[in-house]
C-alpha cells in the first residue's frame, strides 16, 4: 500500500507522520511537510502530476487547503482516496466535503480541544487496522503519545502541573534532535517500550532539556528588551519583536510580561515567517489576525508567512540606498 501524507511542520504535524509510519510502515509512506504559505501549491502540484492508482490513500493532516483546491479534489474524492484531518477554526468550512474532518474539540471525552494527531489517530485506530497491527502495550504507547502531542498543541500542559511537563519535554526534544532523528526515536520507543516507561526520557536527554531551558530563559530576557509596541489595522495594541527561535515559549512569556498588550508578534525575517501569540480569551488570532495576512491557526497561537526576498530588499534599500549614493552613481 502506497500512502501520501501532507502534514504541518510542528509537533502535531510530525506526530501525524509518526502515526502514518506506525499504521502503514515507513517504507510505504511518502511524507511532505508543509506550512501555510506552500500547502496549496504542494497539494495542487501533486494533484495535477500524480498518476491515477499511484497512491492508495492521500492524507492532509494538521493543516488545510483553500476552497478552490478543495472543490477540485472533491470531484475525485468519492473513491475514498483523499482524507483531510484538521482542528483549526479557519478550516471549519471544509466540513461540507465528506472527505474532510475538521473538529475543534475531541469527538469523545470531556470537551477537550483536539489536535491533528488525535483526529488522525482515531481514524487510523478505527478504520485502518492499527489496533490489529500491534499488541496492547504498543497501542497504549500510541494513545499516550497522542495525548502528549494534544496537550502540548492545545497548551493544556500548562494547566496540568508536573503531569503536563512531559508534553513540553517531548516538543523540546523535537527541536533538539531535529525532525528525522526525533521521528526515529519516538517510533522506536512507541514500539519497544512498556507503557509504564513511555516516553522514557533518558538522563542525557534531561541534561539537554535543562540546557535548553537556560538558553530559552536568556533569549526571553534579551527579546523582552527589544519588544516594540504598536497598533494594528484593527486598533489592537500589540508588541512585536524580531526572533528566530523558541516561538511558543517566547510568545507566551512575553504575553505574561506585558499584560497590557493584546497579543505578541514574532517576526522571523530570515525565514519569512510570522508567529502570533496571546493569552487572552477575547481575541482569536487565527481568524481575526493571521487569516488577514494569508495565515491561520488557533485562537491563541497562529502564524503567517511573507516574501522573504521582497522584505529583505526593502530593508537593504532603506539602510544603504540613500539619495547621496544614488547621485554618486
Language-model-derived ranges and their functions:
Residues 124-131, 150-157, 173-181, 190-197:
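Short, well-ordered alpha-helical segments in soluble proteins
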Residues 180-215:
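Long, charge-rich alpha-helical interaction segments
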Amino acid at each position: 500500500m502506497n500512502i501520501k501524507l501532507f502534514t504541518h511542520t510542528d509537533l502535531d504535524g510530525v506526530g501525524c507522520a509518526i502515526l502514518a509510519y506506525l499504521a502503514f510502515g515507513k517504507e510505504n509512506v511518502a511524507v511532505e511537510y508543509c506550512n501555510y504559505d506552500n500547502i496549496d501549491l504542494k497539494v495542487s502540484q501533486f494533484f495535477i502530476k500524480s498518476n491515477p492508482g499511484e497512491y492508495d490513500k492521500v492524507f492532509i493532516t494538521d493543516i488545510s487547503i483553500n476552497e478552490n483546491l478543495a472543490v477540485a479534489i472533491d470531484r475525485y474524492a468519492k473513491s475514498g482516496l483523499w482524507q483531510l484531518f484538521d482542528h483549526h477554526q479557519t478550516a471549519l468550512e471544509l466540513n461540507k466535503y465528506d472527505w474532510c474532518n475538521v473538529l475543534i474539540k475531541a469527538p469523545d471525552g470531556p470537551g477537550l480541544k483536539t489536535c491533528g494527531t488525535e483526529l488522525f489517530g482515531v481514524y487510523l485506530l478505527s478504520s485502518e487496522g492499527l489496533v490489529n497491527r500491534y499488541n496492547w502495550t504498543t497501542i497504549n504507547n500510541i494513545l499516550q503519545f497522542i495525548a502528549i502531542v494534544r496537550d502540548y498543541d492545545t497548551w493544556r500542559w500548562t494547566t496540568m502541573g508536573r503531569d503536563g511537563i512531559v508534553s513540553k519535554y517531548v516538543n523540546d526534544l523535537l527541536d533538539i534532535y531535529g525532525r528525522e532523528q526525533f521521528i526515529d526515536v519516538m517510533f522506536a520507543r512507541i514500539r519497544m517500550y512498556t507503557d509504564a516507561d513511555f516516553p522514557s526520557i533518558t538522563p542525557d536527554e534531561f541534561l539537554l532539556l535543562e540546557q535548553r531551558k537556560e538558553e530559552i530563559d536568556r533569549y526571553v530576557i534579551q527579546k523582552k528588551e527589544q519588544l516594540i509596541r504598536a497598533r494594528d489595522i484593527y486598533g489592537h495594541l500589540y508588541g512585536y519583536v524580531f526572533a528566530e527561535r523558541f516561538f511558543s515559549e517566547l510568545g507566551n512569556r512575553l504575553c505574561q510580561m506585558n499584560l497590557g498588550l493584546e497579543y505578541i508578534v514574532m517576526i522571523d525575517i530570515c525565514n519569512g515567517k510570522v508567529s502570533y501569540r496571546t493569552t487572552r480569551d477575547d481575541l482569536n488570532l487565527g481568524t481575526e489576525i493571521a487569516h488577514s495576512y494569508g495565515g491561520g491557526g488557533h485562537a491563541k497561537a497562529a502564524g503567517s508567512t511573507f516574501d522573504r526576498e521582497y522584505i529583505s530588499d526593502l530593508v537593504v534599500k532603506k539602510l544603504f540606498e540613500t539619495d547621496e549614493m544614488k547621485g554618486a552613481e
